[in-house]
């Protein structure tokens, strides 16, 4: 890609960050109801980050309109602005993000929920805050694999789906794909390889050609009467179907 086009994208990204920071100071309060000025500002943020990086977001299927736990596979940090551009939703992220300069503050003001590193106690705490958000009719996005992948779907962990059971919320599977024009599983610019920094990821995406993200929404179901394991199994199976990826012959972990 030409240096002129990369420079244009970079300048536009800088303008989006500057404008978005001002809007965040004025309007964001650390929660994200599905309607209202906070939701509009956050979606503006995500939509314009995608545009400034030159990455179209293609939507297939329909997001559920009621308070929903959206359960997705996870490939890239760009999954967040991609989903956030079409969903008024709060994301669950690792606690380390909260301390990042500027980005951590912006994420917190946008209503991000955090999970501590650890076992059952950390999961129980995350379940409580997620269930509270769902009970307030806020949407929540969960990347159920617990890590970024190379495009091959890993097992969906079930522990944090307890939040939907506790809140009596809806659960909807979401599949994310970054088509590779050269025939690979994922466009290489989207991959979060070897603990790459956000700056490195953004640099690759700024220079990428023919890059887009596809988001597929599966059928939403009520969590009422289901166990967290059943919900994990359902969402993982549906995501695999949406991406046409076969299930490996390994045991589930929770």
For the regions a language model picked out, list residue spans one by one.
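A transmembrane-helix-recognition feature enriched in membrane-embedded lipid enzymes
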Residues: 1-58, 105-110, 208
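Catalytic core of membrane glycerolipid acyltransferases/transacylases, capturing the structured
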Residues: 20-32, 36, 50-52, 66-120
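Soluble, non-transmembrane catalytic domains of enzymes that act on hydrophobic metabolites at membranes
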Residues: 47, 52-60, 78-80, 156-166, ...
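Residue-level preference for the first positions of well-ordered beta-strands
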Residues: 67-69, 112, 137-143, 157, ...
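Generic beta-sheet signal
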Residues: 94, 115, 143, 174-176
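A cross-family acyltransferase "interaction/gating" segment
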Residues: 102-104, 152-234
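Catalytic-site beta-strand/loop segments enriched in glycine and acidic/polar residues
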Residues: 133-161
